[in-house]
UniProtKB/Swiss-Prot annotation:
Pfam families: FSAP_sig_propep. Residues 23-46, 66-70, 78-82, 92-96, 106-110, 120-123 form a propeptide. The modification Isoleucine amide is found at residues 102, 116. The lineage of its organism: Eukaryota, Metazoa, Chordata, Craniata, Vertebrata. This is Preprofallaxidin-3. Residues 1-22 form the signal peptide. Residues 26-46 are annotated as: Disordered.
Length: 123
């Protein structure tokens, strides 16, 4: 009877040891799988963060651009043109303020599309 008890305890002990070893390996595998999932999630989060930074950068550039257009509707210029938007010089001012030639004939053409003058007689 004593030998049966010893053999039974031996089998029980070996079974428990092998069971604990298997459970330990299973936990390690689960931990590895969780680590891999965590790494993938962190990579996805990093990708989303990079994408979000990119989108925010574009939005800020568009905001700056609209603000520039608000104050400088023709884009950035050199310092002189920024503070003196009217071009200097007689010729450029004439072009700016008098885009239509100021001759009598040109005014007639502009305001009277029908030719004024003698009518040609048909025979």
């Amino acid at each position: 009877m004593a030998s049966l008890k010893k053999s039974l305890f031996l089998v029980l002990f070996l079974g428990l040891v092998s069971l604990s070893i298997c459970e330990e390996k299973k936990r390690e595998n689960e931990d590895d799988a969780e680590d891999e999932n965590h790494e993938e999630e962190s990579e996805e989060k990093r990708g989303l963060l990079d994408f979000a930074k990119h989108v925010i950068g574009i939005a800020s550039k568009l905001g700056k651009r609209s603000e520039e257009k608000r104050y400088h509707p023709f884009g950035k210029r050199s310092e002189e043109k920024r503070y003196f938007p009217i071009p200097f010089g007689k010729r450029s001012e004439e072009k700016r303020y008098f885009p239509i030639p100021i001759g009598k004939r040109s005014e007639e053409k502009r305001y009277f599309p029908i030719p004024i003058g003698k009518k040609k007689k048909k025979k």
